[in-house]
Amino acid sequence: MELLEQRILRDGRLLPGGILKVDSFLNHQMDPQLLQAMAREIKRLFADVRVDRVLTIEASGIAIAILAGLEFGCPVVFAKKSKTKNLADTLYTAEVPSFTHGNTNTVVVSKEYLHTGENVLLVDDFLATGAALVGLRALVEQAGGTVVGAGIAVEKVFQGGGDKLRAEGLRIESLARIASMDEKGIRFC
């Protein structure tokens, strides 16, 4: 998606350790018009499948997931990174290592919000190693649902997660695919 790529080149910043900082428009301060355009593109890319529910992970994927849910006309659920007191004891759980934060989270979704037979679209802001998508897919599988694909804002292709998951049969549509990034700049696929 050229609009997103241009915004990354203009406002994104590279940090040590392979981190792309896009918090001025995507995952801290957000540009609603850009997010809406991204959600519309995800809808276009997945127009051939029925989507009953959108699932993302707390917190940075929530904004784009909500807008995607509006486009598909379906509910949006986000996996929480910790169990809170107001969650029931009937939970689906999965372990998800975080590349950005360098830790592992046990993500949870109440069994009230994922159901057998549902077609679920995974949505997230970044795809690097693929750990978040693996965890989200596990939650859907525990519920007896079907993952129809994953809509991703930014894929770091050089980290291999997308290729691995595609080889396992997961349909992934990424709006911006980064082939490499270093002190010389960001190069898209």
Regions found by a protein language model. Name each.
Residues 1-123, 127-189:
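PRPP-associated nucleotide enzymes
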